[in-house]
Regions:
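Non-catalytic, surface beta->alpha helical segment in thiol-disulfide oxidoreductase systems
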Residues: 78-118
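Local sequence-structure signature of Cys/Sec-based thiol-disulfide redox active-site neighborhoods
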Residues: 4-50
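Structural micro-motif
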Residues: 63-80
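Charged, surface-exposed interaction regions in soluble eukaryotic proteins
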Residues: 49-52, 77
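Secreted/processed peptides and extracellular or luminal domains of membrane proteins
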Residues: 38-41, 60, 72, 112
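Solvent-exposed loop/turn segments at secondary-structure junctions
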Residues: 30-35, 55-59, 72-73, 83-85, ...
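Structural microenvironment flanking redox-active thiols in thiol-disulfide oxidoreductases
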Residues: 18, 28, 56-65
Length: 118
């Protein structure tokens, strides 16, 4: 199937952008099968997610940014505190889009459009 030039945004663009606006960070590695599953959930909209590649290009080490963040498993998602909480929430493993919605307040609609709940 050849990739064509699509007009308009991908179905999950607004949701992915909302995750980034809310401060969600996704840490992964290019060689990680579960990261590939997570990426597939977003499709073309993955480019709008705040993704941090943790693997060195030779896949034998971890980049300093991920060492400093304490990342030990992939995929890992960090979410900033939502009042009254004061600490970052970290979840490890493939997350369903609905879970990401709950963690951020970004609404996942049937059309893929997202809005923020008050």
């Amino acid at each position: 199937v050849a990739a064509g030039s699509n007009s308009g945004p991908a179905p999950l663009d607004a949701f992915a952008s909302c995750l980034t606006e809310k401060g969600a960070t996704y840490y992964g590695a290019f060689w990680c099968p579960n990261c590939q599953k997570q990426n597939a959930m977003f499709g073309k909209s993955k480019k709008l997610v705040n993704y941090v590649e943790c693997s060195t290009p030779d896949s034998k080490g971890q980049l300093q940014v991920c060492i400093d963040a304490g990342i030990t498993n992939y995929p890992t998602w960090d979410f900033p505190p939502i009042a009254p909480a004061t600490t970052t929430t970290r979840v490890i493993g493939v997350q369903e889009l609905e879970t990401l919605s709950q963690m951020t307040g970004c609404v996942l609609s049937g059309s893929g459009a997202a809005t923020t709940t008050p």
